[in-house]
Amino acid sequence: MAVKIRLRRMGAKKNPFYRIVVADSRSPRDGRFIEEIGYYDPIKKPAEVKIDEAKAQDWLKKGAQLSDTAKSLFVKAGIIPGRAKTNEA
């Protein structure tokens, strides 16, 4: 079973809110998940990110893969080393 750490969309139309979850890579984006480890609210200024670092590190040690967006959030939160992606053409 390939496990991914990714975002699950919540909220209302035109007002997204994301939960950071650990899920089987074959399950749909908003479908079944194993564990919730944080949230991301892009509407607030500045955007609010809260990640349970202990749970995240535990899942990464177990071999969970990060989605691209989750990886950038983890870098910004300082959970994993690296540089935040920039939008360069």
UniProtKB/Swiss-Prot annotation:
Its Gene Ontology cellular component terms are: cytoplasm; small ribosomal subunit
Q: Which GO terms describe its biological process?
A: translation
Q: Pfam families this protein is in?
A: Ribosomal_S16
- Is Ribosomal protein included in the keywords of this UniProt record? yes
A single Gene Ontology MF term assigned here is: structural constituent of ribosome
**Keywords per UniProt:** Ribonucleoprotein, Ribosomal protein
Bridged cysteine pairs (disulfide) = none
- Keyword check for Aminoacyl-tRNA synthetase, yes or no: no
Please give the family membership noted in the entry. Answer: Belongs to the bacterial ribosomal protein bS16 family.
> HAMAP family attached here?
Ribosomal_bS16
Check the record and name the PANTHER family matching this protein. Answer: 30S RIBOSOMAL PROTEIN S16, SMALL RIBOSOMAL SUBUNIT PROTEIN BS16M
NCBIfam families named among the record's database cross-references = S16
- Identify this protein by name: Small ribosomal subunit protein bS16
Q: Which organism does this sequence originate in? A: Desulforamulus reducens (strain ATCC BAA-1160 / DSM 100696 / MI-1) (Desulfotomaculum reducens)
